Amino acid sequence: MVSSVLEVSYVFCCPNRARGALSWNSGPGGLLAFGTSCSVVLYDPQKKVVITNLNGHTARVNCLHWIRTEDGSPSTELVSGASDNRVIHWELENNQVLKSVRLQGHEGPVYAVHGIYQSGPSDGEQHALIASAASDSTVRLWSKKGSEVKCLQILKFGDGFVLTVCLSTLPDTDAPVLACGDDGGRIHLFVQQDDWFQKMLSLCGHEDWIRGVEWATFGRDLFLASCSQDCLIRIWRLYMKPTSLETEDGSIRLKENTFTIKDGGVSTTVAVILETVLAGHENWVNAIHWQPSFYKDGVLHQPVRLLSASMDKTMILWAPDEESGVWLEQVRVGEVGGNTLGFYGCQFGENGSMIIAHAFHGAMHLWKQSTVNPRQWAPEIVISGHFDGVQDLIWDPEGEFIITTSTDQTTRLFAPWKKKNQSQVTWHEIARPQIHGYNLKCLAMIDRFQFVSGADEKVLRVFSAPRNFVENFSVISRQSLSHMLYDEDNDLPEGATVPALGLSNKAVFEGDMTYLTSEEEELLSPAFGYPQVIFQPAVLSEPPTEDHLLQNTLWPEVQKLYGHGYEIFCVTCNNSKTLLASACKAAQKEHAAIILWSTTSWKQVQSLAYHTLTVTQMAFSPDDKFLLAVSRDRTWSLWKRQDVTSAEFDPFFSLFAFTNKITSVHSRIIWSCDWSPDSKYFFTGSRDKKVVVWGECNSSYNPMEHPINPCSSILDVGSCVTAVSVCPVLNPAQRYIVAVGLESGKICIYSWSKTNQETKDWTSCVETTPSQSHTLGIRRLCWKSCSGSTEQSEEGTEWLDFASCGEDHTVKIYRVNRCAL
């Protein structure tokens, strides 16, 4: 098999903060589909990898649904709705997009979709019937047959909003029935008669917004489950009334709602009664899901089991008692600890042996049923990621993990999980070093287990890894613990905790830890308030669950750096790990100054003033002789390190070269910059769609005699450049490898070499396909250090790794074939 030039190795993401943004394909090996920003992600829970991305929406994906087959086999069609007012029907083959069709017509964001297969009255051929609800107070019915899509009908709800929809067919007929739950606590039932959906009745009972409705067929009865913000679940039974009239015998009967339909010229009376009310949740019930039918021993089974998810952080599995028929709570699972707000959705998977929920903060919680004790469910490892735009990322110096930071106010650490006696390696989030109260903006590694981060505040914060993290990281990634702790202080803290109403991670040492009794743990329940989260060390052999990440993987904060007048915007560290450079948002020259800090004394070394607006990115040259800065004022500045006479003195920098409004090639904000690995050239990328190479840089040159000018042709990439990164190694032709990230989400890889003919200096090597690309702007690109391990195949082909992050909430790791560039 011929390998491609560019591959996506790993993806880190999580579901959007929207009800209905997750759907699990029924059947063994079914894929989990969920919306991440503007993209639909297909994830394999068994292999724990992202299979592909479906990119087609231009705004947040709010809802999606696999169109399930009648025989319980895995579906190949998926429907999604988004805030771009569109519904997209995806047809898949071998888990890849075969074709997609846009259903346009809504005038507001789409918040609910559902679909079923329907046989045509004339030819009997199956086609998809799709219902979608949007904030324009309408529900639209669509028919998709082959490549033809048409809107069958528009149901208008005046000033009300339909929040959830579900389609099915009436028992013993082919008539589709539609249930719509609205913001008035009512469920509206529509039945298709003569190719037209007619309203039959409204079911009342809920006292708040309806958040979910779902049909399920059991025998000759059709059951409808509904959930609401009144904390209750109602189950309705719909059945065909016999034609023979029965005499009233005076017995007590449940109230019936009836309506009449015509099927083939025969009138049939349909009755709807309230089967039961389930009260077990203590907060809004956001989602319900019937267990799908599945084949067992060649027989199609439809279990009578219902799953519900609530804002009370629990998910409940309901089923009727075998003897009495009373619906009872069978299993309750949930989330403990942390500043979280409950579950938004839930799904059955793997023939009911697995259940999953996604939470307000994006985290997914997966549980698997024990084969020994069916009433026991254990947490499983599942994908995780940021739930807002990812602003910065960096590899550790040895290329063994990456740290990312985001406007979701968290810093996360992703590393490989190397299982014992298994060759397959998967990457997972293994720590959350910082959970902050401000949106995080930037970070830089100081050494392997120490980093500094900047947020929408004036302070830089420095964090160091605790002993518990280093020990767990060595086990999960199968690294030598003695090698990791070789240069570390023996007095490492065990972990960290955040005081109540505090923003600083306080170190916890072995003597500070208290182990709680069961009675003391009860006092930490929500009934007794929310006290300070207490760190509890744990020995891990696999990636941690969300509960553990929230409260047991923080890194202690060892230093605060004060000096900037406004919010921190960028930070970087030199290669010898002795100096930090930071800059903040600025509208005046005095605030746009770069501050240099010593990493040993944590004191300010120097303030470098040149730019008049915000410095957007900085980079030290690989030999640490220069510091490059680019700015919103459309210029760059190059600072030269001056030699000092004694080691007692900190180094200082002087302005070596710069551009101004006349000499600057760029006409818009310069977003990014990077150095060539030999420190001869530097690259700048701007919003004006240009990438320019500058040089040659030599600290022994006099900049007046040898000015630094563009030494390349201007590369126009066709979209705003937001990130530039130069690979630390050259391609086989000894050309520089440059990755360029665009505002459109695409990543392009070029090679460049200085030539006498400037028009031929740039070569386009490869660019990401739509499914490989981000869906919003790239924020940072970073190549893996080649001091780490570089994979080599049997043919001796070297693979280079780089990571990307963007405003689409996603972090990706790519592999690129060096010999093909």
Swiss-Prot record:
A GO molecular function held by the record: protein kinase binding
Main location: cytoplasm
Keywords: Cytoplasm, Nucleus, Repeat, tRNA processing, WD repeat
Pfam families: WD40
WD repeat feature ranges: 56-100, 105-152, 160-200, 205-246, 280-328, 338-377, 385-424, 435-473, 563-607, 610-649, 665-704, 716-760, 773-821
GO cellular component: cytosol; elongator holoenzyme complex; transcription elongation factor complex
Swiss-Prot/TrEMBL GO biological process terms: regulation of receptor signaling pathway via JAK-STAT; tRNA wobble uridine modification
Matching InterPro entries: Elp2, WD40/YVTN_repeat-like_dom_sf, WD40_repeat_dom_sf, WD40_rpt
Biochemical pathway: tRNA modification; 5-methoxycarbonylmethyl-2-thiouridine-tRNA biosynthesis
Cellular compartment(s): Cytoplasm; Nucleus
SMART domains: WD40
Function text: Component of the elongator complex which is required for multiple tRNA modifications, including mcm5U (5-methoxycarbonylmethyl uridine), mcm5s2U (5-methoxycarbonylmethyl-2-thiouridine), and ncm5U (5-carbamoylmethyl uridine). The elongator complex catalyzes the formation of carboxymethyluridine in the wobble base at position 34 in tRNAs.
PANTHER family assigned: ELONGATOR COMPLEX PROTEIN 2
Entry note about domains: Folds into a two seven-bladed beta-propeller structure which is required for elongator complex assembly.
Quaternary structure note: Component of the elongator complex which consists of ELP1, ELP2, ELP3, ELP4, ELP5 and ELP6. Interacts with STAT3 and JAKs.
Sequence similarity: Belongs to the WD repeat ELP2 family.
Protein name, entry field: Elongator complex protein 2
Organism encoding this protein: Rattus norvegicus
Lineage: Eukaryota, Metazoa, Chordata, Craniata, Vertebrata
Name of the encoding gene: Elp2
